[in-house]
Amino acid sequence: MRIKFISFILIFFTIFAFAKEQNLDDFEQEYQNYQVNDPFSGYNKAMTSFNVALYDYGLRPVLKGYNAITPEFIRLGARNFFDNLLAPLRFVGNVLQFKFEEAGEEFKRFAANTIMGFGGLMDVASKMGLKKHPADLGTVLAHWGVGSGFHIVLPILGPSNLRDTLTLPATWYTSFTAYIDPTWASIAISAYGFGNELSFRLDEIDEIYHNTPNLYPFLRDAYEQRRNELSK
């Protein structure tokens, strides 16, 4: 269960962070010929439909209510806090790819936000011009030549591939929340962090899920292309 929640966070952060930076029409035009190893496309399409329904009838209504009763400054503080917890993973990922400049900037971000940002509640690093450099164990393996394997859509967790799925257990143990006892508290904290981040992206997700022709190929190619870009 622990692994599922942290992987849920990482996978969806990857997809929605990329989608936020891209115009949907531009993406479709640029990556329409992108090739993905997808031998289980029938299953993947069905699981994508399941995940969309789960979002529409489960996550979205709950998060709409959460947004209505929770002040934005609280949500933003929580967002910054959980993002700061991922900084050590980004630091390690960049070091293992020999991206020392990026790793150094991640270290500075973590130090600035932890010390001057009240434990990460405030993102002072961005105001100082320090940028994030996404990296994780999956991008490390990709950087050193490990292929992605076949594409797979996981129940609830969403798009992934064989390589990234196999890194999820190790990824979990690089997270501070992995060492919180009891286990239910660790799961609850991770789930809240994911849900809070998602609460900022409901309009974007609605746009992608309900206004994108050929949704499954779009999500599949977005995920695989973004992962490849991060490994360079």
Per-region residue spans from a language model:
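Bacterial N-terminal signal peptides that target proteins for export
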Residues: 1-6
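Bacterial N-terminal signal peptides
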Residues: 7-15
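N-terminal targeting leaders of membrane proteins
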Residues: 17-102, 188-232
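Short low-complexity stretches enriched in small and charged residues
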Residues: 41, 109-111, 174-176
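Mid-length scaffold segments of soluble, non-membrane domains
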Residues: 81-159
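Surface-exposed interaction patches
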Residues: 120-127, 140, 145-231
